[in-house]
């Protein structure tokens, strides 16, 4: 179950409402980098968490914190929409050009939500849960979580740089700080599991004899006009300690040409596809 406080996790203040910034803040709510995504991702990972119960507890706790971030962002959107034009006449009175674009705001903030936040991104597209990653493998999920927090922090810093509002900058600095913690929090879980080397390859429970190990540790170049760039990925021991990284400058073609043969009768193909015989050409 969940408990709720009437107070926000952190103060949210807007010194000068900005409907355009309200539209941009929607990305932090309903975008693929946003808080709905991470809240639901951590929640469903927790629902399928097996093994160390501490990890499930951590996931649930962080999912709940992300819900608190949605609450704060929703309040920030509403505050930025204060005083937004509600009619053709009101918009035109402010600026004749604003009539066409409503000051850059999302018109659905008027038409659909009455000047409040929605579960959509900055383009007004609803969040559809297609970017929720909960694999049941804790190592894979933690790496996905680091990526989610990293892209979320990138978004928050871009929003911070976009606005000149001191209240919004203060609020966003808090979200940036929490993303800093959450990135490292999920990496710390991997460390608790023995570190990245012990976790790789994911899943580390698959028997090595089931893998074509001769193909496991070379970095493959597919460029026709450039050699493979050299780096840690092309030399030295693999992170799992099971092999050595090498470079292969061109693919070794071990397969044959993929020919499917003739089409099946009744499949809707042309007669020539079924028979494999080209039609006679008229003389």
Regions found by a protein language model. Name each.
Residues 1-283:
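Non-heme di-metal
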């Amino acid at each position: 179950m969940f408990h709720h406080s009437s107070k926000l996790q952190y103060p949210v203040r807007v010194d000068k409402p900005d409907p355009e910034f309200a539209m941009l803040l929607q990305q932090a709510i309903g975008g693929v980098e946003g808080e709905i995504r991470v809240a639901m991702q951590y929640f469903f990972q927790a629902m399928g968490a097996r093994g160390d119960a501490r990890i499930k507890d951590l996931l649930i706790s962080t999912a709940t914190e992300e819900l608190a971030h949605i609450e704060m962002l929703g309040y920030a959107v509403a505050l930025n929409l204060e005083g937004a034009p509600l009619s053709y006449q009101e918009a035109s009175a402010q600026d004749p050009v604003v009539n066409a674009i409503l000051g850059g705001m999302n018109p659905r903030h008027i038409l659909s939500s009455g000047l409040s936040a929605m579960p959509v991104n900055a383009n007004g597209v609803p969040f559809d849960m297609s970017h929720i990653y909960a694999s049941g493998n804790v190592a894979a999920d933690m790496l996905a979580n680091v990526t989610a927090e990293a892209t979320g922090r990138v978004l928050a810093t871009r929003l911070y740089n976009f606005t000149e509002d001191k209240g919004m900058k203060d609020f966003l600095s808090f979200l940036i700080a929490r993303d800093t913690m959450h990135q490292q929090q999920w990496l710390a879980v991997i460390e608790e599991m023995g570190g990245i080397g012990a976790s790789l390859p994911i899943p580390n429970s698959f028997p090595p004899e089931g893998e074509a190990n001769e193909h496991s540790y070379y970095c493959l170049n597919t460029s026709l006009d450039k050699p493979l760039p050299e780096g840690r990925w092309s030399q030295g021991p693999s992170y799992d300690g099971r092999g050595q990284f090498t470079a292969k400058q061109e693919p070794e073609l071990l397969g044959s040409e993929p020919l499917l043969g003739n089409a099946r009768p009744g499949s809707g193909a042309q007669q020539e596809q079924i028979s494999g015989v080209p039609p006679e050409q008229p003389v």
